[in-house]
Amino acid sequence: MTVLIHVLGSDIPHHNRTVLRFFNDALAATSEHAREFMVVGKDDGLSDSCPALSVQFFPGKKSLAEAVIAKAKANRQQRFFFHGQFNPTLWLALLSGGIKPSQFFWHIWGADLYELSSGLRYKLFYPLRRLAQKRVGCVFATRGDLSFFAKTHPKVRGELLYFPTRMDPSLNTMANDRQREGKMTILVGNSGDRSNEHVAALRAVHQQFGDTVKVVVPMGYPPNNEAYIEEVRQAGLELFSEENLQILSEKLEFDAYLALLRQCDLGYFIFARQQGIGTLCLLIQAGIPCVLNRENPFWQDMTEQHLPVLFTTDDLNEDIVREAQRQLASADKNTIAFFSPNYLQGWQRALAIAAGEVA
């Protein structure tokens, strides 16, 4: 049997590194279909830190796409698992037959599914991508994204799968030792990416709570984002006093980020799509409820796991937030499907499906 090849077709260092390390640490030892990767980006020590993997790096999207298409044409039994498919050339290859449906398996990350960009080239490309998506052999995604995808592509097979968030299961009870009282601290957004709509989110928080809460905005990723960070800072200072606004412009190490989250009382995410599942997982693990846009279908995954969900359209106050905290504190976090290690079973099944080992 031909070994499955995994494709990270865009240079998204943080997410690509997370996927590679997860495969190296959790999957490669038990499956030959978890070892071969084609990745856009620089090595930057990844080969050394992932010795169980065979990783081929490419300088750009086009060079990787050309290599994938060549492999697909040379051997029609070769199957590919695309993780977060942001590479237009690969969509066009699927649409034109360069890659066959039986060769194309896609793990939806969220941003690669929704049509939120307003630029002309995106508006021209989206209809073509939609046509190509009808030809995918199987999609893997969160429950909410599967539901969203099925509305337009009901005939494409869908399987539940969660991004492998880096988590320590021993911290599932860490919320129990924190006393929550006094001024609330609210985390706004999951990164410095513009998709978080930071300014609109800050205005929404201010409309709900006024200048009575402390707002923390993590913007250390992506790099070279100083102009946008300053734009958010100025907008924030028009709404909140300086002591109540904390803009984090430096990237935090994982342990420091965990410590930051533990100081929060609420996460506030205004974006109208599924994204930031890593931050949501870590907040929920710490017993911190999240406010979501109703258009973000991840609320379906949360309710399926019997977790409280607050919405941006709700009338929020401290009593409501504290009640959601109480409900989270009483939830059995060891059974949550999108937590580590529970998502591992889904990955093992996904590998078997994509490799053709199970129907």
UniProtKB/Swiss-Prot annotation:
Membrane topology: Peripheral membrane protein
Pathway: Bacterial outer membrane biogenesis; enterobacterial common antigen biosynthesis
Coiled-coil segments: none
Pfam families: Glyco_transf_56 (PF07429)
EC primary class: transferase
Alphabetical UniProt keywords: Cell inner membrane, Cell membrane, Glycosyltransferase, Membrane, Transferase
Entry's localization field: Cell inner membrane
Enzyme Commission designation: 2.4.1.325
Catalytic activity: beta-D-ManNAcA-(1->4)-alpha-D-GlcNAc-di-trans,octa-cis-undecaprenyl diphosphate + dTDP-4-acetamido-4,6-dideoxy-alpha-D-galactose = alpha-D-FucNAc4-(1->4)-beta-D-ManNAcA-(1->4)-D-GlcNAc-undecaprenyl diphosphate + dTDP + H(+)
Entry GO terms, CC: plasma membrane
GO molecular function: 4-acetamido-4,6-dideoxy-D-galactose transferase activity; fucosyltransferase activity
GO biological process, one term: enterobacterial common antigen biosynthetic process
HAMAP family: WecF_RffT (MF_01002)
Free-text function comment from the UniProt entry: Catalyzes the synthesis of Und-PP-GlcNAc-ManNAcA-Fuc4NAc (Lipid III), the third lipid-linked intermediate involved in ECA synthesis.
Protein family membership: Belongs to the glycosyltransferase 56 family.
Name of this chain's protein: TDP-N-acetylfucosamine:lipid II N-acetylfucosaminyltransferase
Source organism of this protein record: Shigella flexneri serotype 5b (strain 8401)
